[in-house]
C-alpha cells in the first residue's frame, strides 16, 4: 500500500482514482501528475514501483498544497474574514450561506436542522 501525503492509497484502484483520495487533489490534478511523470492512466497502484511512488510523492510535495496545509490555509482564510468583520465574515460567524443564496426558505444544510418555534401553528 502506497502512502502519499499521509494518506494510504487503495492498492486495487487505478492511479488516477487513488490520487483523488488525497485532500486537495481532484481528477484533473491527478491526470496532470500522471501525465507529467509518464504513468499510464490505466495502471493500478499495486503495479507501481517504489521509484514511481517516490516520484509522485516528490511532485505533490513540490507543486501542490494538500491535506493538513490546505485545510489550515482554508481555516485561516475564513478566520481572517471573520476577524475583519466584513459581510462574508459575518455570514460565516452566523452560520448562514455566504454567497448570496436565499435564506427565507431553504439553506437547511448551512443553517442546520429546523428548530421548532413554540406556539407557531398554521
Curated annotation (Swiss-Prot):
Ribosomal protein recorded as keyword: yes
Region described as Disordered: spans on this chain: 95-122
GO cellular component, one term: small ribosomal subunit
Gene Ontology process terms (BP): translation
Example GO molecular function: structural constituent of ribosome
Keyword Ribosomal protein on entry: yes
Pfam family for this entry, one: Ribosomal_S13
Keywords, alphabetical: Ribonucleoprotein, Ribosomal protein, RNA-binding, rRNA-binding, tRNA-binding
Quaternary context: Part of the 30S ribosomal subunit. Forms a loose heterodimer with protein S19. Forms two bridges to the 50S subunit in the 70S ribosome.
Reported function: Located at the top of the head of the 30S subunit, it contacts several helices of the 16S rRNA. In the 70S ribosome it contacts the 23S rRNA (bridge B1a) and protein L5 of the 50S subunit (bridge B1b), connecting the 2 subunits; these bridges are implicated in subunit movement. Contacts the tRNAs in the A and P-sites.
NCBIfam families, per database record: uS13_bact
Family the UniProt entry places it in: Belongs to the universal ribosomal protein uS13 family.
This protein's name: Small ribosomal subunit protein uS13
Gene source species: Sphingopyxis alaskensis (strain DSM 13593 / LMG 18877 / RB2256)
Name of the gene this protein is made from: rpsM
